[in-house]
A protein has these predicted regions:
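Alpha/beta enzyme core
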Residues: 3-11, 15, 27-52, 57-76, ...
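Poly-acidic low-complexity segments
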Residues: 4, 23, 154, 188, ...
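A short N-terminal beta->alpha junction/helix N-cap motif
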Residues: 17-25, 50-54, 261, 265
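Short catalytic-loop micro-motif centered on adjacent basic/acidic residues
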Residues: 19-23, 81-82, 103, 204-207, ...
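Active-site proximal loops enriched in glycine and acidic residues that flank catalytic Cys/His/Asp
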Residues: 173, 208-210, 232
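C-terminal alpha-helical cap/extension of soluble enzyme domains
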Residues: 213-287
Length: 287
């Protein structure tokens, strides 16, 4: 059964570990992440971008697939299904479809409008028992066509949004989506610390978890990050394993063209990536 992400993240913040949000793109992705969470006895958040939701034909399809898998796999660990970087309209659709958590990305609105829309969603989510993530300061890189350049959020704006009653807060601290450029300056721990001081027990979210050095990840968790988003790394692992299979000519041997065989190496690569991340984040055996 899907759960709100609130309880798992409050526990993570108090226990100085982080829960991974791993984005799903199809059945293989979802199955790989759910199986790994069960094997690691770890809570997990399945992230769905608006683009991925559209690709999977819509949010109701996603909810049906995830709920069906949870039942068929006899999953016992806490699992949240979360809209990633949702527009206001996307949030409304996911609330209706049966998601257990949403992120409203109002970072491109003026702060007053971000506050007004967030307030409205806080009330709806509280009524439905869903968790809500808000964002302040755009995260760098490109996410479904929205480009941000890795800026640092204003800690006072973070406090203003946190005080509205959201369950978790994503704040830009120099992080970006996708591969990090060679001249990346690293995370701003000064900004993170200032945000943490003003937002107290609020679980903080680190987007763009791919490619951030392990020591920075651990320090971010120490400073209050309780949710870390990973997407690109799983995609790269899946692509590399699939390419290796095809380049070795395995799709031409026997029934190697069978999609279940063709996609198996990529599936295993996602599992391994997720396992390594759960170990790094400290969420193993925290279910």
């Amino acid at each position: 059964m899907l759960v709100s992400a609130k309880e798992m993240l409050d526990k993570a913040k108090a226990g100085h570990y982080a829960v991974g949000q791993f984005n799903i793109n199809n059945l293989e992705w979802t199955k790989a992440i759910l199986l790994t969470a069960q094997e690691c006895n770890s809570p997990v958040i399945l992230g769905v971008s608006e683009g991925a939701g559209k690709y999977m034909t819509g949010y109701k399809t996603v909810v049906g697939m995830v709920n069906g898998m949870l039942e068929e796999l006899n999953s016992t660990v806490p699992v949240a299904l979360h809209l990633d970087h949702g527009s206001y309209e996307g949030c409304m659709k996911c609330i209706e479809a049966g998601f257990s958590s949403i992120m409203f990305d109002g970072s491109h609105y003026p702060i007053e409008e971000n506050v007004a829309k967030t307030k409205e969603l806080v009330a709806i989510c509280a009524e439905k028992g869903m968790s809500l993530e808000a964002e302040v300061g755009s995260i760098g890189g490109e996410e479904d066509g929205v480009v941000g350049r890795g800026e640092c959020a204003d800690p006072n704006e973070c406090k203003a949004i946190a005080d509205l009653g959201v369950d978790m807060l994503a704040a830009g601290i120099g992080n970006i989506h996708g591969k990090y450029p060679e001249n990346w300056e690293g995370l701003s721990f000064e900004t993170l610390d200032a945000i943490q001081q003003l937002t107290g027990d609020m679980p903080l979210v680190l987007h763009g978890g791919t490619g951030i050095p392990e020591d920075m990840i651990k320090k971010a968790i120490d400073l209050g990050v309780a949710k870390i988003n990973v997407n690109t790394e799983c995609q790269l692992a899946f692509a590399a394993a699939t390419r290796e299979y095809v380049e070795a000519g395995k799709d031409l041997q026997g029934k190697g063209f069978d999609p279940r065989k063709l996609l198996a190496p990529g599936f295993e690569a996602i599992k391994e990536t997720v396992k390594v991340k759960m170990e790094l984040f400290g969420s193993v055996n925290k279910a």
